[in-house]
């Protein structure tokens, strides 16, 4: 899911049809401009924030694009994202930010 300026602008894969509204965790990611990895959402007290994304997703990455946009990726097993995955998606976030800047998104 790509969320930009209060709107979900792209959904791919198996996600809920509900409108995703970012909560505290997503907002902290873009405020701090840091990737947040929830390796096992079963133990995360704020997991309800992601129910409208995809209920019971075992792991989640929140990747900031800029101060008003982020990428949300769900994994289908616990601890499924590697450091290489995180670096790869961070680079995609940088590319998306460049596209947003060029096109006044």
Predicted features and spans:
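Short, flexible beta-strand-to-coil junctions
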Residues: 3-5, 66, 76-77
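Acidic/histidine-enriched, beta-strand-rich ligand/metal-binding domains
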Residues: 52-57, 94, 99-105
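Short beta-strand-to-loop transition segments that serve as allosteric relay/switch motifs
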Residues: 70-80
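Amphipathic alpha-helical "output/dimerization" segments
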Residues: 81-101
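Regulatory sensory and allosteric helical modules in signal-transduction proteins
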Residues: 3-53, 58, 72
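Extended amphipathic alpha-helical coiled-coil/heptad-repeat regions
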Residues: 65-69, 83
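Short hydrophobic beta-strand micro-motif common in sensory/regulatory domains
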Residues: 56-66
């Amino acid at each position: 899911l790509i969320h930009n300026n209060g709107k979900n602008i792209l959904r791919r894969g198996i996600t809920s049809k509900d409108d995703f509204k970012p909560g505290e965790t997503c907002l902290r990611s873009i405020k701090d401009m840091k990737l947040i990895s929830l390796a096992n959402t079963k133990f995360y007290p704020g997991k309800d924030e992601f129910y409208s994304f995809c209920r019971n997703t075992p792991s989640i990455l929140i990747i900031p694009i800029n101060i008003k946009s982020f990428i949300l990726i769900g994994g289908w097993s616990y601890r499924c994202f590697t450091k290489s995955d995180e670096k790869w998606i961070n680079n995609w976030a940088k590319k998306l930010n460049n596209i947003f800047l060029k096109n006044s998104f």
